[in-house]
UniProtKB/Swiss-Prot annotation:
Organism: Archaeoglobus fulgidus (strain ATCC 49558 / DSM 4304 / JCM 9628 / NBRC 100126 / VC-16)
Main location: membrane
Domain of life: Archaea
Keyword field: Cell membrane, Hydrogen ion transport, Ion transport, Membrane, Transmembrane, Transmembrane helix, Transport
Gene Ontology, cellular component aspect: plasma membrane; proton-transporting V-type ATPase, V0 domain; vacuolar proton-transporting V-type ATPase complex
Subunit structure and binding partners: Has multiple subunits with at least A(3), B(3), C, D, E, F, H, I and proteolipid K(x).
Molecular-function annotations in GO: ATPase binding; proton-transporting ATPase activity, rotational mechanism
Family listed: Belongs to the V-ATPase 116 kDa subunit family.
UniProt cross-references to Gene3D superfamilies, sorted A to Z: 1.20.1460.20, 3.30.70.2170, 3.30.70.2750
Protein name (database record): A-type ATP synthase subunit I
Function: Component of the A-type ATP synthase that produces ATP from ADP in the presence of a proton gradient across the membrane.
Record lineage: Archaea, Methanobacteriati, Methanobacteriota, Archaeoglobi, Archaeoglobales
């Protein structure tokens, strides 16, 4: 779970005449991640199966049909699986049938669309001319006159007048543009054309039409007729889709599988008599794989690793959903720790801490469960499962905080029923806790405690990240590099933590938690003699920070100076970055409080509008509550989700996770519509 699944590198060697059978078996087993081959003196990359081009054309044809029909395999649950022999027997017949039922109709629809576009273009030419009110026969056919008809961005009349007064301009507006017809003696034609071009002239070709009105009516009727026929053909295609969807997808899956197998020689080295391919497979499947290959007359040999093996993530079902978030950031290298389990634990907790509302959490859960029924692809299913986990954690934290569409207890002289539309019911729910939340994050003490808790979480998470980084570097480069690169920062962050705890000790956080003395009895500086009263007690946290920071600096210099020289010492300021990242965890409090106060304001305004004692506008109040909480819910999903991701990607992953691996992609496919 913490490491990708162990892989072994194998070679598969056999007689060349068995390559086809081996391709079938490899595809069926769906185990071997095949490596790209490198040619040698005696082995060359093979050639695809002779039928590959035929299958390729058929596959392109089927995918074209499926694309046009907008068939989504992930959203179709097959009523039965088709046997491969059944598909093979009727393949030619079905391809011809679908070409007639779908292909020819698609071509017809394309021709109809082209005709409609052509007719629409004619309309676009004729309608502006109709607006001018000049018959087509008067707009062309002159020997001594030049006629210009088209669109312009500005009226050119004044510019024409500077050339000659012997011209006529007819102009009118059409769809926010100016349409003009210009008549001028031929001798001024070139000059007028230049002026028109300066005015943004776009010519309109004048068609041979006697009556614009009649022609427009004729074209519109023809367009309507074509659209009607198009709708009829689309209905016919839809009927084929409903009836043949599963068969279409089964044939596409069969052809895709055949294409994979026919192209396997391109990933295989062949000689005159034999073939060899190299790849990786899970170590636990090696014995079974060898047995099946031996039975097929093909040898399997385990090879030494070369380069980086592919990564096959190995996580339990619940954790597997969060692989989506891990691989979005990067794919773990083969020998790296897989951080998926940590993001599976902490992402929902952080989301719940920030949103922390029973009502919002319930909506997130219900919406995610509903969308799982709509979006069936693996990616959507995983993301929506994460939404369910996050929603459940929000409900749990919401119960702890005592919030359901906002708080029902706030500082001030307000009764729950005055500030919340179900305030009385919530107060009754918490009778076991004297009508108050288990933990109130709105009141002053709750804010201080939660702020301190988030900083402690930040310290622990960053230290844990560096500990994982220590392991990764130790595995890759050895103990010395791990100590200089990661242990040094663990010690440095511990020093920072002592300073933060010392400050909290001084300002009385521990005192308020019942874990320390009154801050008035604690000197702000750790060294005796610097101020009166030091004998009352020393701040042990500051004292502990000093040796930790000294040890950190020594290890840091030992690690950086050999690599970068004296300039490497300057990088010690990076310790302040870790301080900023520790404080960044305070967003677990800040984001949540912003959502709480927005919900409080929405409820307060809504209840004031509904309250019969004041200005009673119940409908407006209900609208305020509805729109306000919908908007706050959207913010409550986006902000905690993004901020929780950021705390993992930036503050946590960067301490140990390099990424850059490549996913395990075995040769073969999981078949949903066909079976052997």
């Amino acid at each position: 779970m913490l490491k990708p699944e162990r892989m072994v590198r194998v070679s598969v060697v056999g007689p060349r005449e068995k390559l086809g059978e081996t391709a079938d078996l490899l595809h069926r087993l769906n185990l071997v991640h095949i490596e790209e081959p490198e040619e040698s003196e005696y082995f060359r990359i093979g050639e695809p199966h002779p039928d590959a081009s035929v299958v390729s054309r058929a596959l392109v044809q089927m995918r074209s049909f499926i694309s046009h029909l907008k068939l989504d395999p992930s959203r179709i649950v097959p009523r039965r699986k088709f046997r491969e022999s059944e598909i093979e027997a009727q393949l030619k017949e079905k391809l011809d049938e679908y070409q007639q039922l779908i292909g020819e109709r698609i071509e017809y629809l394309r021709s109809v669309d082209e005709k409609i576009a052509s007719l629409q273009e004619q309309l676009n030419q004729i309608e502006p001319l109709k607006r001018l009110g000049i018959p087509a026969r008067l707009l062309k056919g002159y020997k001594t006159l030049r006629v210009f008809v088209g669109f312009v961005k500005e009226n050119p009349t004044e510019k024409f007048a500077q050339v000659t007064s012997d011209f006529e301009v007819f102009a009118t507006e059409y769809e926010k543009e100016l349409v003009v017809a210009v008549f001028v003696k031929a001798e001024y034609g070139d000059e007028f054309l230049r002026i028109l071009q300066e005015c943004g002239y776009r010519e309109i070709q004048v068609p041979d039409v006697e009556d614009f009105e009649a022609k427009i009516s004729e074209i519109e009727k023809e367009i309507e007729s074509l659209k009607s026929r198009k709708e009829q053909v689309e209905k016919e295609i839809e009927e084929v889709k409903v009836k043949e969807a599963e068969t279409l997808l089964a044939i596409e899956e069969y052809l895709s599988s055949q294409m994979d197998k026919y192209e396997l020689p391109l990933r295989t080295l062949v000689s005159k008599y034999s073939f060899v391919l190299v790849g990786y497979l899970p170590a636990k499947a090696l014995n079974e794989f060898k047995a099946k290959m031996d039975a097929n007359g093909v040898a399997v040999e385990v090879l030494d690793e070369e380069g980086e093996p592919p990564t096959k993530l190995s996580n339990p079902a619940g954790v597997r959903n969060f692989e989506l978030l891990t691989t979005t950031f990067g794919i773990p290298k083969y020998k790296e720790i897989d951080p998926t389990v940590f993001i599976a634990i902490f992402f929902p907790i952080f989301f719940g801490m920030m949103l922390g509302d029973i009502g919002y959490g319930l909506l997130v859960t219900v919406i995610s469960l509903y969308l799982k029924r709509v979006f069936k692809t693996e990616g959507w299913q995983r993301m929506l499962n994460i939404g369910v986990y996050a929603g459940v954690m929000s409900i749990i934290f919401g119960f702890i905080y005592g919030e359901c569409f906002g708080p029902f207890i706030v500082p001030g002289e307000y009764e729950p029923y005055q500030i919340h539309f179900i305030g009385s019911q919530l107060e009754h729910l918490y009778e076991f806790h004297h009508g108050h939340p288990i933990f109130d994050r709105v009141e002053e003490m709750g804010v201080k405690i939660l702020l301190f808790a988030t900083i402690v979480i930040g310290i622990a998470k960053i230290l844990f990240g560096f500990a994982l980084g220590f392991y990764n570097v130790y595995v890759e480069h050895g103990l010395k590099d791990a100590i200089l690169e990661k242990l040094s920062w663990i010690i440095g962050v511990l020093g920072l933590a002592m300073i933060i705890f010392g400050f909290a000790y001084n300002v009385g956080v521990f005192y308020q938690l019942g874990m320390g003395p009154n801050p008035g009895d604690v000197p702000p500086l750790p060294l005796p003699g610097l101020m009166e009263g030091w004998q009352a007690g020393l701040n042990v946290y500051y004292l502990a920070a000093l040796p930790l920071l000294v040890v950190w600096f020594i290890l840091f210099v030992m690690g950086e100076v050999p690599k970068m020289g004296a300039m490497g010492v300057i990088l010690a300021v990076e310790l302040l970055t870790w301080f900023g990242q520790i404080m960044s965890y305070a967003r677990l409090l800040a984001i949540g409080l912003s959502s709480v106060y927005i919900a409080f304001v929405i409820n307060f305004i809504g209840m004031k509008l509904i309250d019969p004692v004041g200005i009673s506008i119940p409908i407006v109040g209900a609208i305020v509550l509805l729109i306000g909480h919908v908007g706050n819910l959207i913010l409550g999903i986006l902000d905690p989700g993004l901020q929780s991701l950021r705390l993992h990607y930036v503050e946590f992953f960067t301490k140990f996770f390099e990424g850059g691996g490549r996913l395990y992609e075995p040769f073969g496919r999981i078949k949903r519509f066909i079976e052997e």
